Amino acid sequence: MEESKTLKSENHEPKKNVICEESKAVQVIGNQTLKARNDKSVKEIENSSPNRNSSKKNKQNDICIEKTEVKSCKVNAANLPGPKDLGLVLRDQSHCKAKKFPNSPVKAEKATISQAKSEKATSLQAKAEKSPKSPNSVKAEKASSYQMKSEKVPSSPAEAEKGPSLLLKDMRQKTELQQIGKKIPSSFTSVDKVNIEAVGGEKCALQNSPRSQKQQTCTDNTGDSDDSASGIEDVSDDLSKMKNDESNKENSSEMDYLENATVIDESALTPEQRLGLKQAEERLERDHIFRLEKRSPEYTNCRYLCKLCLIHIENIQGAHKHIKEKRHKKNILEKQEESELRSLPPPSPAHLAALSVAVIELAKEHGITDDDLRVRQEIVEEMSKVITTFLPECSLRLYGSSLTRFALKSSDVNIDIKFPPKMNHPDLLIKVLGILKKNVLYVDVESDFHAKVPVVVCRDRKSGLLCRVSAGNDMACLTTDLLTALGKIEPVFIPLVLAFRYWAKLCYIDSQTDGGIPSYCFALMVMFFLQQRKPPLLPCLLGSWIEGFDPKRMDDFQLKGIVEEKFVKWECNSSSATEKNSIAEENKAKADQPKDDTKKTETDNQSNAMKEKHGKSPLALETPNRVSLGQLWLELLKFYTLDFALEEYVICVRIQDILTRENKNWPKRRIAIEDPFSVKRNVARSLNSQLVYEYVVERFRAAYRYFACPQTKGGNKSTVDFKKREKGKISNKKPVKSNNMATNGCILLGETTEKINAEREQPVQCDEMDCTSQRCIIDNNNLLVNELDFADHGQDSSSLSTSKSSEIEPKLDKKQDDLAPSETCLKKELSQCNCIDLSKSPDPDKSTGTDCRSNLETESSHQSVCTDTSATSCNCKATEDASDLNDDDNLPTQELYYVFDKFILTSGKPPTIVCSICKKDGHSKNDCPEDFRKIDLKPLPPMTNRFREILDLVCKRCFDELSPPCSEQHNREQILIGLEKFIQKEYDEKARLCLFGSSKNGFGFRDSDLDICMTLEGHENAEKLNCKEIIENLAKILKRHPGLRNILPITTAKVPIVKFEHRRSGLEGDISLYNTLAQHNTRMLATYAAIDPRVQYLGYTMKVFAKRCDIGDASRGSLSSYAYILMVLYFLQQRKPPVIPVLQEIFDGKQIPQRMVDGWNAFFFDKTEELKKRLPSLGKNTESLGELWLGLLRFYTEEFDFKEYVISIRQKKLLTTFEKQWTSKCIAIEDPFDLNHNLGAGVSRKMTNFIMKAFINGRKLFGTPFYPLIGREAEYFFDSRVLTDGELAPNDRCCRVCGKIGHYMKDCPKRKSLLFRLKKKDSEEEKEGNEEEKDSRDVLDPRDLHDTRDFRDPRDLRCFICGDAGHVRRECPEVKLARQRNSSVAAAQLVRNLVNAQQVAGSAQQQGDQSIRTRQSSECSESPSYSPQPQPFPQNSSQSAAITQPSSQPGSQPKLGPPQQGAQPPHQVQMPLYNFPQSPPAQYSPMHNMGLLPMHPLQIPAPSWPIHGPVIHSAPGSAPSNIGLNDPSIIFAQPAARPVAIPNTSHDGHWPRTVAPNSLVNSGAVGNSEPGFRGLTPPIPWEHAPRPHFPLVPASWPYGLHQNFMHQGNARFQPNKPFYTQDRCATRRCRERCPHPPRGNVSE
């Protein structure tokens, strides 16, 4: 709590100040909004409940508004946390600021009295623990506490009515508070002061109840037992310290006031208002909303509390709004259903006998017989003969349900192959697949290598059974042996598992592929139930009888197999990792509670002693307990329906203690089952959908409701009535009050509670004849009381436990112990009637249903129903329901009938199916719409000659325009030489640098990164070098280089590198150490490119395709350009006939030559001149570029199966993903040298679907003949909106700061560097005395990045909407799209035209305002090399880039020198068009020297490359749209330096050769040339001279292009050659001949 700012004087009234401050500090529920509750505290409350349903309710209350970290235990009694949770609460609250109030004698006196009461309670508690109390003393204490409680006057009539029930609630709270008091350290002061009065003011009324005594002696999760003596001493010490603390007194006084404050002052209300208030509150109580007894210290304005949803509510209007919420309605229905299930009466002997008969008949009908088992064994023997003929070293064995006898008649036959270690698992199964396919004994032979356990599936021709053949599945075989041994030892095990499996099959929850549970998990669930019930039928496999066994280190004990069919063998191997984990857990426990040093020493000695231990544990109990099969079946359903919290605990059959999810580090979601031999993974993880889990829980409830109620052959009348009553309750929407929620409206007084509690402690005396029926009624009464506890107090009963391990034990112990006498009597009765004699006949199949029903008919008629005054005093509706059901139990036995019917058990609801691919419900993985392999591809029309020529030219144009010229290659070599000399001089003279990657492999773009590898002479590899230190030292040296900037060492990567940027060229590069394998990779790619020119053409086309679709950046979750080049090479190798050979398969001899590099064989055939001699058929493929490009798209969309095969260029034979063990990856691309490197490993399924969608759309676009407008072909074919359906590439895995994958936003290096600069700026401002905004920069929030753009490098800004660098989200063109579309920009454009027209002659070519061209969705390339900062180039260079400079004011002269960052908008990053300028061949004006005019006075028409951006057809009078050079794909507007004298080619019809210069917009795309439309840039006057006319020179592209896009200067440029300028008539004539509008226009 924050300190009050209004408490300036001690004369202020405390009450008014408290309420004022609390109303300011606390957020409460109002009439309009309900605020979310803290998830962490809700989960802590869930941990304190062993009941699955109650924990589920808590999870549904995650939207609660209260802050439970500092919740008052006395006010919010519905969710009182356990001691561990309270410790967390106290720790959180101890950091809050205490609110100070003026000291007063009254408050001091109250604090002293409170502390005295606390000391008195402590002494009484110590005495109570030292000496047991007699029943009389217990009753006396209960009476005194009841009298003390009754002295308090209720604040309202409603409170007076619910006083007795609230009494029990408060007594239970105080009992828990006394127990919690032992564990509260003295450092926690915030809540101790709140609860001390509650602990010490009154005695515990239920301290000696059996449940309380068990809780006091149980063990918590950390393994520390509650020592009573030490606990008393700790509490007394803490209380003595609190007595001297003034802050404790003040806070205690504050809490005293708040607790004594009245929630609603009824004295100020009129009688009519009080009556209306009472009626309204009675209506709210029906929906479990009650008025708070005392004012909440945290929610002072809240008057009501919903005990069902645990939400504080401000007033009645807010309560009515909360009642209408779906969450509240759902919780009410679940509460009602749970209460009704708990109120069901116990079964009668006839009922249990009928259940036994139903289970036995099911086992006989659907279970396998000895003959079926023999048939399955013969199948295994026959298959063993077939396989061992080809693989003699292998052997086959039967495992699974066929061997355990848990199989149904239609179950599969599981066969496992044992093979020697020298054999490979994938190769073995592939061979077995081929063997079985060739054999006539088996049909429908298929492979399922992508399953959790890879298998070969076939069907035996003779028997028709389905066989699943696996290999090396040793763990499953061990589990099978265990279950088989248990089935032989315990006769009820097999029929129970069969009934459970058949029930799961009927409900369709055993299908693992559709999101269900594996079938053998149900056997483990039955085994777990038989271990946990009281008394147990099966022992646990590990326990305290093993010397040195610790449940915390249970993973050190490993089960090794079954010995003599009676024991399980175990070994203890204490691993270092386990020891570290246990030490960490012990340290964590130490922080909560101090441990004794002697105990730690003993534990260490035990851990050392249990190393390398082994032994065996029995599988059967010494004295087996016999229970009827029907009773076990009903208890099994009840156990998993009501008793066991599935979402909280782990089903573990190894130990007796309940294992929590925290012990296994498994998430608290759905069902967790541990395999006893494979303990690391959850075998029920296939149930990964909450919808399926809720469906499973619903089926459990439906099954328990059906089998717990008496059923007849003609239909269950009682069940029908029961459902009718349930529907009536729901339709009336009048749920019972929370106080009376126990058994549908039972009001239980405190006297009745005392009587029943006393009767629980007394042994039950009964005769042999009427023992069963009498005990049933007593159990029913106890059940009523238990249900009252759960319903009346919400979560009180579940929160009274002191540890997770003790939460479930009292419930199981109490209920199962009460059933023990009835089990004995029932066994004798059943033995007399010869129904099921489990002690004599181990085979339950020998009894028949007819004998059971006929013999038990007489016994059921002699039952006597005994009554109990404590039960009959509860005159409630639940008792009437129970009596109705008891009347139905007295039906003749022959009328009781149970059947496993699908409609009954599923309630007619279809199963919930969840796809394992997309994780969506409603379909299976075979019908998943997101599976691109399921898309029906329409056949493509035949290709025409004209369309083929267009595709050829488009592919060639990709290479011509994007491949780096020779001059750029030369400049890259010069940069490398300069760096090498500098490093040799400054760092190490033995350093050698070499280029690799895109600079040398023949597939590099212009402005591609510089990939440099550094080696040191005298070292063949980096084994003896400290690579991290070398990289860091190299980064320090490179920072001294004047020509480099942005030096960044990255030492945490797989290959440590140093990143840098070359100032002059703007190229980015990285230096790696001994990346020699990549050099060989580069050489091989260059060799492939030199074999056939079509390889390079297709490689460049593929890279352009990937860039346009935004699927070519591995750092953002897609594939790298290197991976796409490998895809091109693989296609050309697999083409028939092939275009290129497999270089790694061409060698002399039978063995591949060895050229080992970094542990891998880097051999490939590199003698290209000898290829034609070795492979005469190499040049047989004569397909054109267009045909090959379309064939590539069709190959990867129609033929290649990404799921089954790997893209591998090292072999011609198909390589399967199963052979590489890459079945879990969506795309598998093998590195040709590093065979363990999958280039598609980082691609998610969502990104795979996006990539395949682009390929499918590309197949349709490039395969459908269409003739776009002249010069618009590239724009048509590479339209990203068409290729990606207008969608953005998935970026859910990308960092929001830098747009990369592999780290979270908090760990982003961009953010860290920005934070460092911010702190540095703050320190400078502090030194200068500027402290204005210093505090706002201490913590950086990504949402405030735009606030710091004035002093940041624009390259550090990155928009996570479009992914572009240089701006943030607020300034993104995508965000401004809607406003730009709706706003009228004609006037603003007109002003710009006027300003641009007034430019002085000789001024620089200015860059206009921001273009209104909208950024496309896929134009979000993250390559920083596409947007380098503009740099001034020396004037001795051969060319000069036409760098546009923004002008701050119209008509102002631009500044000379490099451009300033502040002069341009943050989202526009300027970029030079050409990196390496050359000297002009002719004279030029002095303006050229200042960088204000292009180098050549002559504007040369260049070929059009309008691949980027949409085309805007401007209306008459509209202004031009200027190009933004920050666009990453501006490279498409940079023509390469190519000869300009290529003769023009003509196609079908007349193709124009000229285009008006002013008819181009944006990236060179052709637009309309209407009156008033101006070009991209204002005309440049040539020294006030008239514009000359030149003869037209043939262009390098048969279509015209704006002269401003021509490459300025060329190595083969002829300066004296005249040129003609182009007019607008050509474009008009072209548009008249081609009336159809072009593709890709965004505006008309």
UniProtKB/Swiss-Prot annotation:
Mg(2+) binds at D1009, D1011. It comes from Homo sapiens. It is found in: Nucleus; Cytoplasm; Cytoplasm, Cytoplasmic ribonucleoprotein granule. This is Terminal uridylyltransferase 4. Residues 112-125, 206-222, 1441-1452 have a biased composition (Polar residues). GO terms for biological process: miRNA catabolic process; miRNA metabolic process; oocyte maturation; polyuridylation-dependent mRNA catabolic process; pre-miRNA processing; RNA 3'-end processing; stem cell population maintenance; transposable element silencing by mRNA destabilization. Interacts with LIN28A in the presence of pre-let-7 RNA. Interacts with T2BP. Interacts with MOV10; the interaction is RNA-dependent. Keywords: Cytoplasm, Magnesium, Manganese, Metal-binding, Methylation, Nucleotidyltransferase, Nucleus, Phosphoprotein, Repeat, RNA-mediated gene silencing, Transferase, Zinc, Zinc-finger. It holds the Pfam family PAP_assoc. Residues 901-1634 are annotated as: Sufficient for monouridylation activity. Residues 1401-1426, 1453-1470 have a biased composition (Low complexity). GO terms for cellular component: cytoplasm; cytoplasmic ribonucleoprotein granule; cytosol; extracellular exosome; extracellular space; nucleolus. It is an enzyme of class 2 (transferase). Residues 36-46, 238-252, 582-603, 806-816, 1334-1348 have a biased composition (Basic and acidic residues). A zinc finger (CCHC-type) spans 913-930, 1293-1310, 1357-1374. Residues 31-63, 96-168, 205-257, 579-617, 794-816, 1321-1348, 1401-1482 are annotated as: Disordered. The modification Omega-N-methylarginine is found at R1624. Its cofactor is Mg(2+); Mn(2+). UTP binds at residues 998-1001, 1008-1011, 1081, 1103, 1121-1125, 1237. Zn(2+) binds at C306, C309, H322, H328. Residues 628-678, 1184-1237 form the PAP-associated domain. Changing K321A: Strongly decreased LIN28A and pre-let-7 RNA binding and pre-let-7 RNA uridylylation. Residues 253-333 are annotated as: Required for interaction with LIN28A and pre-let-7 RNA. It catalyses: RNA(n) + UTP = RNA(n)-3'-uridine ribonucleotide + diphosphate. CDD domains: NT_PAP_TUTase. Signal peptide: none annotated.
